[in-house]
Amino acid sequence: MFFPELPVILHKRLRQPQAADMEDHHMKLVECIPNYSEGRDEAKIAAIAACVKETPGCALLDIQKDATHNRCVLTFVGSPEAVEEACVKTAKKAEELIDLRFHKGAHPRMGAVDVIPFVPAMDMSLEECVALSKKVAERIWEEAGIPSFLYEASATRPERRNLADCRRGEFEGMPEKLLQEDWAPDYGTRAIHPTAGITAIGARNPLIAFNVNLDTDNVEIAKSIARAIRASNGGFRSCKAIGLKLEDRNIAQVSMNLVNYEDTSIVMVFEMIRALADRFGVRIIGSELVGLTPAKALLDCAEYYLKLENFSAKQQVMEYHLIDLESGDAGNE
């Protein structure tokens, strides 16, 4: 998915054998982008991230945190075996540190580790990522006592493919949901972990997390726009969207996942949101990308055109990290 020089670039960070040996063995890489329900406590976020940094064979590429959503997202890449270990370690650390009974944030959530997606990176198939997701789900149940739903390509039932359907009810409503006939966890018993809730785990293709901020405090406008553009309501085929209120900024936000950026581009949704916002007499005041984004998705999106807030190509585009690794300028932070 990246480029042929990837083994050479990554071998130092991944603490693997020399690049030539890796090429001979057709090195497999998987990307993992778990979301944790903590975006305010720096010490807790650092402790979770340390579980990845300390795992041989893993490279932690990015940490995104948001106090309003009270959520953080790690992006790391490594061999399937290393990524499995890192995922289980972070889940156990999140179970230790995060208590959802006291969690408040703008973003929907059902677990301390809310979602764990696996994405094929190099010489990995989606089917192999599905198998990995099941191994991780089983271990997180056995070692941390956290049940899980399998979602996206790993889903065992059609209604579990969509993350939003799995998460509906959130932490507070999940005990009752698990008692429904169709909603027993794929791993674990029909009871959430008392403080860490339940996790969604699955394999998927790359997506872009893209948010657009509006100059209004009326969250109903953001929700109306989200309904119009998301696939489930007849909007863009590869767009998932919700409307949120950012209390600390007193503005509304359209928060999106673009699950196939070749099919539904950033520009397409941005322009549609602009047009719909105009109908309400509302302007776009900024946008943001959450986590790492494929460079290809940004080639047609000039920074000034999208009014990106706090965007740093150096920090948020995966290829820049890989270039730094090749030059020896970057290391684990």
Residue ranges and their predicted role:
Residues 1-2:
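Hydrophobic alpha-helical signal peptides and transmembrane signal-/tail-anchor segments
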Residues 26-333:
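Long, contiguous binding/interaction regions
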